[in-house]
Amino acid sequence: MSVNVNRSVSDQFYRYKMPRLIAKVEGKGNGIKTVIVNMVDVAKALNRPPTYPTKYFGCELGAQTQFDVKNDRYIVNGSHEANKLQDMLDGFIKKFVLCPECENPETDLHVNPKKQTIGNSCKACGYRGMLDTHHKLCTFILKNPPENSDSGTGKKEKEKKNRKGKDKENGSVSSSETPPPPPPPNEISPPPHTMEEEEDDDWGEDTTEEAQRRRMDEISDHAKVLTLSDDLERTIEERVNILFDFVKKKKEEGVIDSSDKEIVAEAERLDVKAMGPLVLTEVLFNEKIREQIKKYRRHFLRFCHNNKKAQRYLLHGLECVVAMHQAQLISKIPHILKEMYDADLLEEEVIISWSEKASKKYVSKELAKEIRVKAEPFIKWLKEAEEESSGGEEDDEDENIEVVYSKTASVPKVETVKSDNKDDDIDIDAI
């Protein structure tokens, strides 16, 4: 049974069809796997190598894939239903098959491993553009380009030279052959048309404003992809410095207050999201850190929420700020930690773990120890609050116990015992 390649189109006479995926589960236990029986036929209908959609399934499912090209067996580890894979295939088709302009599946991929770019051209509407290379499958495509793909300008130049050589051979006339007769006087021969002119025509033939704008957009997209690839090849230190310059520029331009989403997006692009708080503390904090925690809470929360690694970097960033403004901040450590804790930027577990070991990676060993000594009152308060909460839970459990009274039982004499134990609540402002 066939289905529409673009399943969002419900027209039964839609010309682009593909066979429905057939999945077969094999094996047991840890060796269970799903074999896509007709992957070759499906890939042929999409004009893509069968390894691409199979690898796409692996990326989306977080599963390993196996390719047995000789026997046409394409395998995804684990047990997966055919309907689930069919729905997942729609995502692959949308990202890597359909034209963004006309939504027809008549596209070819043009992979350039040297420049780390993947181009996309449509034979239906003439669209030409660059694919977004953020998806994990793009790494696989760059390493395994399709057979019909251009692998860079070197290949084109080589083909161009070969064509020129063949043209010269075909155009040369040997002495043994008789030259062709000249055309009649009243017949005009067409002007010579070389291969070089044909190759140059497709760039300059359309001079309308819209065509020029489209070409410029393609160039800018191409440049963005190249920049992204170059940045990800840099070291972690270099990428963190790029993020630092980005945040610093936003502050200098006076738009830092509304740039929290852009900063997180840039950190994710550079793959240094966990280290974002370390950069933010350096740019945004000074001796007025307590007021600044409230002001930039949203910025830090985008990094630190449910991210313990980012919270640890925030604490290391705090150490760096204290090192720069030691005279003003060293005595305020407990208050600063309390502000961060109340703002939901730090969790108890992370703070306690940080306090147990001094590190000399960001500040001197002596200063790191002194900071933790100054933080002890707050750490003690945290631990006692945690013990009280756990004790309260035990009391709640005791209250839920059902007591059965007996009329025949003797009632013991109850003596009232005065408790000298008083709850000593710690006032954090008095620390």
Curated annotation (Swiss-Prot):
GO terms for cellular component: cytosol; plasma membrane; synapse. Component of the 43S pre-initiation complex (43S PIC), which is composed of the 40S ribosomal subunit, EIF1, eIF1A (EIF1AX), eIF3 complex, EIF5 and eIF2-GTP-initiator tRNA complex (eIF2 ternary complex). Interacts with eIF1A (EIF1AX) during scanning. Interacts through its C-terminal domain (CTD) with EIF1 or with eIF2-beta (EIF2S2) (mutually exclusive) through a common binding site. Interacts through its C-terminal domain (CTD) with the CTD of EIF5B. Interacts with FMR1 isoform 6; this interaction occurs in a RNA-dependent manner. The modification Phosphothreonine is found at residue 227. Pfam families: eIF-5_eIF-2B, W2. InterPro entries: ARM-type_fold (IPR016024), IF2/IF5 (IPR045196), Transl_init_fac_IF2/IF5_dom (IPR002735), Transl_init_fac_IF2/IF5_N (IPR016189), Transl_init_fac_IF2/IF5_Zn-bd (IPR016190), W2_domain (IPR003307). The modification Phosphoserine is found at residues 10, 229, 389-390, 410, 419. SUPFAM superfamilies: ARM repeat, Translation initiation factor 2 beta, aIF2beta, N-terminal domain, Zinc-binding domain of translation initiation factor 2 beta. GTP binds at residues 27-34. GO terms for molecular function: eukaryotic initiation factor eIF2 binding; GDP-dissociation inhibitor activity; GTP binding; GTPase activator activity; translation initiation factor activity. It comes from Pongo abelii (Sumatran orangutan). Gene3D superfamilies: 1.25.40.180, 2.20.25.350, 3.30.30.170. Residues 233-392 form the W2 domain. Residues 178-193 have a biased composition (Pro residues). Keywords: Cytoplasm, GTP-binding, GTPase activation, Initiation factor, Isopeptide bond, Nucleotide-binding, Phosphoprotein, Protein biosynthesis, Ubl conjugation. Residues 153-170 have a biased composition (Basic and acidic residues). This is Eukaryotic translation initiation factor 5. It is found in: Cytoplasm. Residues 196-209 have a biased composition (Acidic residues). There is a cross-link at residues 413, 418 (Glycyl lysine isopeptide (Lys-Gly) (interchain with G-Cter in SUMO2)).
